[in-house]
A protein has these predicted regions:
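Glycine-rich phosphate/pyrophosphate-handling loop used in enzymes and phosphotransfer proteins
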Residues: 1-171
Length: 173
């Protein structure tokens, strides 16, 4: 451990990314929370317009609260933990089944407000873990209402319709 890391840990002791209690051991999650993570171990979900997907954990409880802190609460450093978990899931469940690593970007206004694009941070961390360079394939050209304000999948699809511009051309083989 470097002197700088030691000083930072002294001034800002590391906390569990889920419950935010002080960590006594190594890793970003305390043993209590690690045992209670809502791990998804079922079948691969069906993802429209793709040949499949993978889920690391159910989006509920402390994990959901933690992810909302990452997304809206200035906890950009959580990307390391979430990215590592997602990369592990990709290696486990999607090895050899993907062609590109990309993300759906937030609007400039949301990026300015938050200070970062959480999707891009996650994608870069996953890329680091998988030794795969992410490729930006989309640009957000409209800033519709937040998806979280909408009630169902149909409203969410309609909300993002026309919001993104493709930066690449994909041709059929």
């Amino acid at each position: 451990m470097s002197v700088l890391s030691w000083l930072l840990d002294l001034l800002y002791p590391p906390k569990c990314v889920l419950c935010r209690k002080l960590l006594t051991g190594k890793g970003p999650v305390c043993p209590h929370c690690m045992d209670k993570l809502p791990e998804f171990d079922g079948a691969a979900p069906s993802v429209r317009f793709t040949s499949g997907g993978a889920v690391s954990f159910f989006y509920e409880g402390q994990l959901r609260e933690s992810f909302l802190r990452f997304k809206f609460g200035g906890s950009a450093f959580y990307a390391q933990t979430y990215g590592a978990w997602m990369a592990h899931t990709i290696r486990d469940r999607l090895a050899g089944k993907y062609d590109v690593l990309t993300w759906a970007p937030v609007s400039r206004a949301r990026k300015r407000k938050r200070g970062y694009d959480q999707s891009a941070l996650l994608c870069r961390e996953i890329g680091t873990q998988l030794r795969l360079e992410p490729i930006q394939t989309l640009r957000k050209i409209k800033d519709p209402p937040a998806q979280s304000t909408l009630a169902d999948a149909a409203q969410r699809r309609a909300n993002v319709s026309g919001a993104y511009l493709s930066l690449i051309h994909i041709s059929e083989p």
